[in-house]
């Protein structure tokens, strides 16, 4: 349908998705795994591949909505916050690019939602899910280590958060 093609990094990620592995030269494997599954379902056409980041951005927007609700926003303002994310220039322009940042942002946001739930409810299930989602974050981009460092700083500075984590039986 079009003469457009993937950018260099996007083509590299797509090639990785054709040869799945446990890791690649400079990146963890999760984006390639997701693209491989996505391509298997929807094909390898340019239009199909370019809709992948759009779908992920809508999941990120929903995670932002849930994060805002956990931060005590009302539903209307949480929806506005999620919508604002979709229309800010950085997000709206990058929503057409296949990159490791997509999945990192998704799992980072979900991790924040789960962290708030752990602090508020001290739920073992949410604590387990937080670890799982953080693991997915690390499999999407190594920069997820900064979430863990921020979490350690939070636990050091905020006694309530530390108490919630310490009291968790997991």
Set out the residue ranges of the language-model regions.
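Loop-to-helix entry region of an early transmembrane alpha helix in multi-pass inner-membrane enzymes
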Residues: 29-33, 42-62, 94-98
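Extracytoplasmic catalytic/substrate-binding loops of multi-pass membrane glycan-assembly enzymes
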Residues: 2-13, 22-38, 43-48
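Membrane-interface alpha helices of multi-pass inner-membrane proteins
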Residues: 19, 114, 126-142, 148
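Membrane-interface transmembrane helices that cradle and orient dolichyl/undecaprenyl
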Residues: 69-72, 111-127
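Short helix- or helix-capping micro-motifs
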Residues: 78-89, 134, 138, 152
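Transmembrane-helix signature of polytopic, membrane-embedded enzymes
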Residues: 64-87, 105-106, 125
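Perimembrane helix-loop-helix junctions
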Residues: 114-120, 134, 147-170
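Short acidic/glycine- and proline-prone juxtamembrane loop motifs at membrane-interface regions
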Residues: 90-104
């Amino acid at each position: 349908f079009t003469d457009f093609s993937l950018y260099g990094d996007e083509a590299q990620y797509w090639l990785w998705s054709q040869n799945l592995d446990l890791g690649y030269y400079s990146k963890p494997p999760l984006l390639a795994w997701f693209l491989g599954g996505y391509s298997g379902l929807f094909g390898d056409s340019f239009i199909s591949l370019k809709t992948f980041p759009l779908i992920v951005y809508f999941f990120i927007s929903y995670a932002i909505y849930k994060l805002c609700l956990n931060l005590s926003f009302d539903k209307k303002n949480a929806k506005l916050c999620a919508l604002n994310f979709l229309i800010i220039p950085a997000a709206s322009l990058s929503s057409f690019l296949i990159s490791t940042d997509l999945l990192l942002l998704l799992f980072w946001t979900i991790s924040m939602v789960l962290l708030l739930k752990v602090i508020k409810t001290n739920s073992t299930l949410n604590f387990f899910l937080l670890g799982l989602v953080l693991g997915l974050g690390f499999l999407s981009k190594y920069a997820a280590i900064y979430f863990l460092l921020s979490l350690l700083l939070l636990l050091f500075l905020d006694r309530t958060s530390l108490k919630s984590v310490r009291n968790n039986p997991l």
